[in-house]
Regions:
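Conserved beta-strand-loop-alpha-helix hinge in the C-terminal portion
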Residues: 222-246
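C-terminal end-of-chain micro-motif
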Residues: 1, 246-247
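ABC family nucleotide-binding domain
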Residues: 4-5, 10-223
Length: 247
């Protein structure tokens, strides 16, 4: 597969009073086109910091990002950061981040509205994605009228409607029960396979990580192991315990 995003020697340091915190230490890896990477690690290991940097929500202290063989030099300041996100990144969060005052279809339409697309095109795309995530009958409902799994499906449709090459998912099943979590992960797998959308997903759950094609293990701001996923949970748990600690 061709390289989509190359992360090279990425570091992030915070200064808090007299304390220096090294959130990321020389992190390097490649996300291929159509790739699906799960990132596992303990709280505070740098997983979410990495996603924030890849989404241009935070800037690295050092290191480089190369997207489609083009080094991204200016994406950490506005307005370049917003443009980068609009063109290349879709976000899925643990807490859904839907707007309560908008209907399901209005929430899904937001990225296209922000791009200034015409109403006809927006309505056509929203209809496609409502059907794809199984929420056509819920199009005029508001988020608070939906279950957690349904709300996450809305968030997934919103993230994908502008067809970004990369999805960044931060604990997307963290607020869901086991059955709903499995359904959401199956949906992400299908979208990764059918749309060839590359996914980088942070999780603490080995069952969730097993849906990815590859697992990176973080500890103390560093990648300590990199393992292809076979879909089995046991090897992931074994590697986690070996390199990170007991689950």
């Amino acid at each position: 597969m061709d390289s989509l995003l190359e992360v090279e020697r990425l570091s992030k340091t915070y200064i808090r009073g007299t304390e220096t915190i090294h959130a990321l230490k020389q992190v390097s890896f490649t996300l291929e086109e159509g790739g699906f990477i799960a990132i596992m690690g303990t709280s505070g290991s740098g997983k979410s910091t990495l996603l924030n940097i890849l989404g241009a929500l935070d800037a690295p202290t050092s290191g480089t990002l190369t997207l489609k063989e083009k080094r991204q030099r200016d994406i950490f300041t506005e307005p370049a950061a917003t443009l980068y996100r609009q063109q290349h990144i879709g976000f899925i969060f643990q807490s859904f981040h839907l707007l309560d005052d908008l209907t399901v279809q209005e929430n899904i339409a937001l990225p296209l509205m922000l791009k200034g697309m015409d109403d006809k095109t927006i309505n056509q795309e929203v209809e496609i994605w409502l059907k794809r995530v199984g929420l056509t009958k819920w199009n005029n409902h508001r988020p608070q009228e939906l279950s957690g799994g349904q709300q996450q499906r809305v968030a997934i449709a919103r993230a994908l409607i502008s067809r970004p090459p990369i999805i960044l998912a931060d604990e997307p099943t963290g607020n869901l029960d086991f059955k709903t979590s499995a359904e959401i992960m199956q949906l992400l797998q299908e979208l990764n396979r059918e749309q060839q959308t590359s996914i980088l997903l942070v999780t603490h759950d080995a069952t969730v990580a097993a849906h990815a094609k590859r697992v990176l293990y973080f500890h103390d701001g560093q990648i300590v192991a990199d393992q292809p996923s076979t879909g089995d949970v046991a090897p992931i748990l074994e590697t986690y315990e070996q390199f990170v600690g007991a689950v």
